[in-house]
């Protein structure tokens, strides 16, 4: 992302699940585009950032074969080393998965809270991972996608579960510029909640970003 008035974003959308007809597939290549598509140069200028949105699929013992967490993680380290995103919005992360990411994405820190009020170990997070050498964390917190967004664990409208959003203000070290970032996971099993959730997010953008910093949203 260049820090201009109108901000084009270098975005990478990664699908965690995948397959291959090869009898011995190289799962570490899951994330790559087909060979017919020219890959982008992962390097960045001093006034750019790279943003990734990544639904890692919550840990589920019923997932087997190439859908299993253990198989899918073989692509996670080479993908990050190859693409070097500045910030990553993660969806569907359970605490054991967060622990794995923290231990293996060593150049990154992360922020986030569980979607329920008690931060239970089987709870889901929508954390933000950030490259520590590229950005400085200025401040962060969470709010909930409900009629009472400042109440931890609150569940609004026809959401099937509580939905949380993680927000942060970062300072880009190379340029000295700050930007505002939100990561969340909109409920797809409801009718009213998606639109109402976006209303909450838009209101929170104004409330939490009074400086009018460049804004980014992953979901």
Regions found by a protein language model. Name each.
Residues 1-8:
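Bacterial N-terminal signal peptides that target proteins for export
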Residues 7, 17-104, 115-123, 199:
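N-terminal, active-site-proximal structural segment of metallo-dependent hydrolase catalytic domains
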Residues 14, 46, 82-84, 134, ...:
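Alpha-helix termination/capping residues and helix-transition junctions
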Residues 29-43, 87-182:
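Structured beta-strand-rich core segments of catalytic domains in phosphoester-bond hydrolases
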Residues 48-61, 138-143, 177-187:
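Active-site-proximal beta-strand elements of phosphoester/diester hydrolases
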Residues 62-66, 85-87, 154-155, 185-191:
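Second-shell loop/turn segments in exported
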Residues 119-121, 190-193:
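Solvent-exposed loop/turn segments connecting transmembrane beta-strands
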Residues 162-184, 191-219:
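His/acidic metal-ligating clusters that form di-metal
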């Amino acid at each position: 992302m260049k820090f201009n008035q109108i901000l084009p974003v270098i975005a990478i959308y990664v699908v965690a699940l995948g397959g291959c007809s090869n009898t011995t597939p190289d799962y570490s290549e899951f994330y790559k585009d087909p060979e017919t598509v020219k890959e982008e140069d992962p390097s960045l200028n001093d006034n750019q950032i790279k943003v990734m949105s990544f639904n890692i699929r919550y840990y589920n013992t019923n997932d087997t074969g190439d859908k299993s967490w253990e198989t899918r993680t073989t692509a996670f380290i080479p993908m990050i080393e190859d693409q070097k995103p500045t910030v990553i919005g993660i969806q569907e992360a359970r605490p054991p998965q967060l622990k794995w990411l923290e231990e293996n994405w060593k150049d990154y820190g992360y922020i986030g809270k569980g979607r329920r009020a008690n931060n239970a170990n089987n709870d889901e997070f929508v954390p933000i991972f950030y490259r520590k050498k590229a950005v400085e964390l200025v401040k962060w917190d969470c709010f909930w996608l409900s009629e009472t967004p400042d109440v931890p664990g609150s569940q609004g409208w026809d959401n099937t579960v509580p939905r949380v959003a993680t927000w942060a203000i970062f300072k880009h070290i190379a340029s000295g510029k700050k930007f505002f970032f939100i990561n969340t996971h909109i409920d797809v099993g409801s009718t009213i909640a998606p639109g109402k959730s976006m209303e909450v997010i838009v209101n929170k953008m104004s409330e939490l970003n009074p400086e009018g910093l460049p804004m980014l949203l992953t979901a």
